[in-house]
């Protein structure tokens, strides 16, 4: 058989495959166009494109009231003014001509400091508003359902507790409870029937197990799409969704449904409080404390025209609005894409700060890494797909708002990398980029941070953090912040590779229970060991060859910090594994023995850098 003969059948097969894909896409497009009453013009793998201009909807003024008292507003304005003074003073001091050594060094360092110092701006703008839904607003009487999703890897006992809490809501009107289960067992069917809970499953339905959006397999979007297409749109005005592990408080449903009395509101976001396992997981506590201001005052500040973001699958939707956008958005971050599509279509969002559902945070550090990687990859991937096709539909304020969200992860990764590379490069080269007094630098820079600390303490005192008791400062918060960024950077890189080479992406559901036998993969400690080694070597080279004392000190300081991170991650894994398994520390050591050795190995070059530094300092300063 000749080469041309072997090629011909493959070519015909590929053409037939493309015809099938095109035919399937056309059918789906017609279905979503019909569902949205013509608003979905066409669909792409990245999401829908709308045919009609956005709706002109605005919430009624009577829907919202201010959260803060007049006195608190004055105090917050005073703190904001102090921050502005500290910010201005820092930059006036920093840009003094006497600090300039090289334009390149000053420019690069200034860009990094500008990013770090302006992060507080957006937070200050958001918390200056804090409009909350009026508590006296009457709960509307609607056809209502509350639904929870469950994957096969999620324990039935956990889902059952959530369903029981859903049934026990203090709500003035009738509502239905649904379980959207990927693979319900006979036991689940029997229990749900006895409790009056309805079950939806797409198991064995190929049309709802597609490889890409819409109705994607192994994804909450596809699971919920089956429910909405068969019952949600036709039988209910509002549907409230929950993650399997998030057990709602008794007033959860009332708080989420209340804003829907305003016809302009298409969705209601709620706080994502992942503290159910906070006592047994430092990673869960770290994320919980890091995100407490976000899930409270920051989200609340975006209510009423600034698009609060749905986080997790716990939010409420007006089914008419969801039909309007063609259903839930694509990707792992369906919460964010759905929020974005609602706003692209012109619907308003509210934030129910008092709707509390307590769920699970990451069980282990490995789970935390998986989540950080997947979330950053998903959010960055949107910059290449759906987002640019809708941005022109948004008002300027929302374009700025969503742009800030989308660039958060890339800027976080770049800033962290730059913060490590700059002192190392200066130390090795011996080039002093700027000439400043370091104590003066620390004092002027951290004056801005002190203002933000006062603000967070005020917000915590007013009960606005979620959870209320989250500390403003803690060692878990510090460790989480330092440990997460390498995986965020890896997720950003993964998104770029994924979109450049059109590689398929797969999602991993993190475990919802722990046996204590989980092994800490050594690859999760390697980045910190690499950072410690690189900074220590840079410090030693600088001590042997150059006069850049300040940068050598920064290298040693950074190496010490990441040495603590690597060791702490390993030791804490052993401690938590022993507690979960009910064994002795010696027995649990096997779960992190190799990572601990990898974390300890870089202490040798670090010890050398620390040992040499005093004599190096005296020699350079001529003491």
Can you name each region flagged by the protein language model?
Residues 162-174:
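Short, acidic, metal-binding catalytic loop of nucleotide-sugar glycosyltransferases
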Residues 49-164:
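N-proximal low-complexity "stem/linker" segments adjacent to membrane-targeting elements
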Residues 143-147, 176, 337:
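Cell-envelope/extracellular polymer assembly enzymes that use nucleotide-activated donors
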Residues 87-114, 126-129, 135-139, 408-501, ...:
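Membrane-embedded multi-pass helical conduit in multi-pass membrane proteins
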Residues 181-189, 204-206:
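A conserved acidic beta->alpha catalytic loop
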Residues 242-247:
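The conserved acidic donor/metal-binding loop of glycosyltransferases
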Residues 330, 339-357:
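Catalytic donor-sugar/metal-binding loop of nucleotide-sugar-dependent glycosyltransferases
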Residues 201-236, 250-333, 343-344, 361, ...:
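Long helical/loop segments within the catalytic core of UDP-sugar-dependent glycosyltransferases
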């Amino acid at each position: 058989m000749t080469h041309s003969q072997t090629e011909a059948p493959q070519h015909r097969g590929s053409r037939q495959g493309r015809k099938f894909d095109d035919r399937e896409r056309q059918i789906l497009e017609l279905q979503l166009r019909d569902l949205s009453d013509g608003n979905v013009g066409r669909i792409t793998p990245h999401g829908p494109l709308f045919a009609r201009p956005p709706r002109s909807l605005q919430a009624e003024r009577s829907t919202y009231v201010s959260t803060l008292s007049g006195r608190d507003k004055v105090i917050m304005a005073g703190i904001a003014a102090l921050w502005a003074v500290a910010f201005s003073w820092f930059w006036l001091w920093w840009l003094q001509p006497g600090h300039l050594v090289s334009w390149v060094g000053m420019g690069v360092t200034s860009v990094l400091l500008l990013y770090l110092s302006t992060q507080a701006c957006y937070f200050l703008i958001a918390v200056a508003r804090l409009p909350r839904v009026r508590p006296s607003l009457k709960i509307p009487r609607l056809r209502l359902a509350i639904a929870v999703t469950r994957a096969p890897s999620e324990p039935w006992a956990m889902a059952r507790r959530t369903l029981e809490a859903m049934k026990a809501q203090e709500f003035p009107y009738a509502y239905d409870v649904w379980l959207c289960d990927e693979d319900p067992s006979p036991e689940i069917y029997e229990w749900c029937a006895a409790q009056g809970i309805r079950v939806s499953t797409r198991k064995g339905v190929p049309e709802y197990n597609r490889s890409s959006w819409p109705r994607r397999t192994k994804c909450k979007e596809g699971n919920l799409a089956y429910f909405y297409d068969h019952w949600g749109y036709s039988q209910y005005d509002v549907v409230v969704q929950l993650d399997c592990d998030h057990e709602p408080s008794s007033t959860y449903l009332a708080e989420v449904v209340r804003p829907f009395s305003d016809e302009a509101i298409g969705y209601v976001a709620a706080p994502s409080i992942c503290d159910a396992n906070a006592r047994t997981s430092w990673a869960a506590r770290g994320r919980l404390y890091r995100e407490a201001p976000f899930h409270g005052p920051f989200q609340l500040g975006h209510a009423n025209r600034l698009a609060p973001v749905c986080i997790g699958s716990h939010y409420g939707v007006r089914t008419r609005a969801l039909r309007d956008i063609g259903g839930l958005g694509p990707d792992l971050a369906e919460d964010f894409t759905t929020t974005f599509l609602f706003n692209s279509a012109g619907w308003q969002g509210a934030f129910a700060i008092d709707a509390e559902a307590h769920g699970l945070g990451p069980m282990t550090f490995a789970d935390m890494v998986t989540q950080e990687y997947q979330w950053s990859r998903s959010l960055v991937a949107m910059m290449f797909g759906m987002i640019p096709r809708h941005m022109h539909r948004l008002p300027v304020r929302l374009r700025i708002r969503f742009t800030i969200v989308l660039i958060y992860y890339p800027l976080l990764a770049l800033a962290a990398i730059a913060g490590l590379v700059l002192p190392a490069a200066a130390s090795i080269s011996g080039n002093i980029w700027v000439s400043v007094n370091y104590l003066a630098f620390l004092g002027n820079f951290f004056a801005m941070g002190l203002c933000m600390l006062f603000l967070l303490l005020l917000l915590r005192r007013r009960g606005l953090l979620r959870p209320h008791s989250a500390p403003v400062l803690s060692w878990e918060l510090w460790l989480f912040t330092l440990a997460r960024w390498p995986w965020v950077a890896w997720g950003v890189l993964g998104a770029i590779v994924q979109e450049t080479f059109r590689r398929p992406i797969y999602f991993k559901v993190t475990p919802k229970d722990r046996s204590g036998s989980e092994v800490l993969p050594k690859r999760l400690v390697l980045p910190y060991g690499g950072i410690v080694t690189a900074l220590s070597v840079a410090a030693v080279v600088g001590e042997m060859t150059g006069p850049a004392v300040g940068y050598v000190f920064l290298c040693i300081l950074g190496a010490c910090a990441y040495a603590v991170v690597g060791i702490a991650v390993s030791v804490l894994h052993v401690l938590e594994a022993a507690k979960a398994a009910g064994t002795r520390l010696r027995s649990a050591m096997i779960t992190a023995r190799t990572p601990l050795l990898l974390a300890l190995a870089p202490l040798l070059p670090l010890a050398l850098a620390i040992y040499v530094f005093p004599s190096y300092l005296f020699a350079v300063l001529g003491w």
